[in-house]
Amino acid sequence: MPTKAELENQVESNSQEIRRLQRALKQAHIDLPEIQRKELDNPVPHWIPAVETALNRAEAEWNRVVIEPDARIDDYIRTRDGLGWSWAEQYKKNGQFAWCGAFAAYAWSSVRLDIRQKIFPSCYRFYSRWGKTQRCIEPSLMLPGDIVIISTVNGASWGDHITVATSAPSSDGTFETIEGNARGILGNGSTGEGVIKLTRPMERVMYVYRVLEEDLA
């Protein structure tokens, strides 16, 4: 018979898998009406000053202690500072919208609104629009501010969760993030779901995308 600790571990594992599936389903729903559009040009990636602004905005949101289903999440999704999806239903319930990309869009509010609206909502959109451009860089070249797409077990080939890197890869094969719509360390130091910080393994990285100066408003 399993011990209590073993059962608790299994429950936690199952909860994480359910969350992954729900997130993937919500992102798939976002992309259902998407039609193929002309891909952006291929520029040369490089460091830009706007990175510091993006990281500061992400850090400020983490310090706000945004916990599911905080009304602040609706700002990430529907206002012009985030995705700008003003037509989306008001966010009131945990799991209602896969908002990891919306949080990245809010951090990167300096990016043109049309790009945030069209590309930031899902992993698939990043992959289909930026995957074959020079914005897509080798994971080993990751820098703070890069948009990092990760995959959990049995995830989609284009990834299933959007994060913002706050570090380069470390020697132990991990990197640091601030991200939304995930479970990790909240701004008050507790563990919960919302805007969180996390140490993630590089082996889960699917793609790394870097915003360029020409993407800025």
Placement of each model-derived feature along the sequence:
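Short intrinsically disordered terminal tails
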Residues: 1-2, 142, 215-217
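...with weaker cross-activation on analogous glycine-rich loops/strands in unrelated enzymes
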Residues: 114-187
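Active-site signature of cysteine proteases
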Residues: 169-217
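Heptad-repeat coiled-coil/leucine-zipper oligomerization helices
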Residues: 3, 10, 17-20, 24, ...
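N-terminal capping segments
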Residues: 34-111
